[in-house]
From Swiss-Prot:
Alphabetized UniProt keyword annotations: Amino-acid biosynthesis, Aromatic amino acid biosynthesis, NAD, Oxidoreductase
A GO molecular function held by the record: dehydroquinate synthase activity
Intrachain disulfide bonds: none
Name of the protein in question: 3-dehydroquinate synthase
Reaction(s) catalysed by this chain's protein: 2-amino-2,3,7-trideoxy-D-lyxo-hept-6-ulosonate + NAD(+) + H2O = 3-dehydroquinate + NH4(+) + NADH + H(+)
Organism encoding this protein: Methanoculleus marisnigri (strain ATCC 35101 / DSM 1498 / JR1)
A Gene Ontology BP annotation from the UniProt entry: aromatic amino acid family biosynthetic process
Entry's family note: Belongs to the archaeal-type DHQ synthase family.
E.C. no: 1.4.1.24
UniProt superkingdom: Archaea
Function recorded in the entry: Catalyzes the oxidative deamination and cyclization of 2-amino-3,7-dideoxy-D-threo-hept-6-ulosonic acid (ADH) to yield 3-dehydroquinate (DHQ), which is fed into the canonical shikimic pathway of aromatic amino acid biosynthesis.
Gene name per UniProt: aroB'
Keyword NAD assigned: yes
């Protein structure tokens, strides 16, 4: 998730309140105590959670020398950069070499440019505005700025009941939508998209915040390209939710339910890539077709095409590494 900071120098309580309500990650202020009276949000100030000149740096890019200084500072912490006439080239140069650049912006249009420069975008933005409505607009821009995951259609090759085991329901703090899901796999090299419980069913009410994701051993894809075992997820963790067209956003875990249930193995293939996932054997568990519609594992047949993602390399504590790791 991209960082959303708001510059409140000079202090304005109405803007601070709007920023907090809009999900700002941090407020840049002259006195952190003013922020603490309003809520639990990171304050960037001399007496704050992050201290300017120590944890966070600010610099205006005016020439190649200041650009190089920004890169040097980025090795010590996050760097807020200002580009006088808001030219993109300095941002491109910085983003190409550092993932600790925060762009100073004045509106949602500038934020969108910063967050998409060189496709990867800056680490976040610092918004300076007098308009509460602009704060809300930028918050929406941030929410839609998640990286895209390359999704491919996999052809189902095998569906086999495997007996009883422990499966994991991931209950998020978000209402999830039709046509999106979490990416889960038996190995860290390939994942299937598991649909949330958004659809009507004669047996149980929809639970649009929930994804019945798979067995406890499975990997789930997280923001930033990391993975975690489903069994290791906990309240407050962030998981990656992907739309069937590729864009992603984060969701906060509100609860994890592990229960013993009958399980089903699904295997599929896309070119040379293979994917497998052990899921609960029940009609409410669904994968995602190419057009974004959901298909129940109870109705799934060999030859069906469902969406998934392929990753390269192995994993060490959830982080991608370049070494030979065989998972099967």
């Amino acid at each position: 998730m991209k960082l959303f900071w708001v510059d409140l120098r000079p202090w304005r309580k109405d803007l601070a309140t709007t920023a907090i309500e809009s999900g700002a990650d941090a407020l840049v202020v002259e006195d952190a105590e003013r922020v603490r009276k309003l809520g639990r949000v990171t304050a960037i100030a001399e007496n704050g959670d992050l201290v300017p000149g120590k944890d966070v740096f600010e610099i205006e890019i005016v020439d190649k020398e200041s650009e190089e200084e920004a890169l040097r500072l980025s090795r010590e912490g996050l760097v807020i950069v200002r580009t006088g006439d808001w030219t993109v080239i300095p941002l491109e140069n910085l983003v190409a070499q550092s993932d600790r650049i925060v762009a100073a912006v004045g509106n949602a249009d500038e934020a969108k440019v910063a967050l998409t420069v060189l496709e990867r975008g800056t680490a976040g933005i610092l918004l300076a505005t007098d308009d509460p409505a602009e704060v809300r607009r930028v918050a929406k821009t941030i929410a839609g700025a998640g990286a895209s995951v390359p999704l491919v259609p996999f052809e189902v090759t095998r569906i086999v009941p495997v007996g009883m085991g422990d499966r994991v329901c991931v209950d998020t703090c978000s209402i999830l939508a039709d046509g999106e899901g979490m990416l889960v796999g038996n190995t860290s090299s390939a994942f299937l998209m598991v649909h949330p419980e958004t659809l009507e069913n004669p047996y149980v009410a929809p639970r649009p915040f929930r994804v019945n994701a798979g067995a406890v051993h499975a990997y789930i894809l997280l923001p930033g390209g990391k993975t975690a075992y489903l069994a290791d997820l906990a309240v407050g963790d962030r998981v990656l939710v992907a739309e069937h067209t590729g864009p992603t956003h984060d969701a906060v875990v509100g609860r994890v339910k592990i229960e013993r249930r009958p399980l089903l193995l699904v295997e599929a293939k896309a070119g040379d890539a293979t994917v497998s996932l052990v899921l609960q054997n029940a009609e409410t568990i669904r994968l995602v077709r190419e057009d974004g519609t959901a298909v129940s594992v109870a109705a799934l047949t060999v030859g069906d095409r469902v969406l998934g993602s392929v990753a390269e390399g192995g994993r060490h504590f959830g982080v991608a590494v370049k070494e030979t790791i065989l998972e099967k």
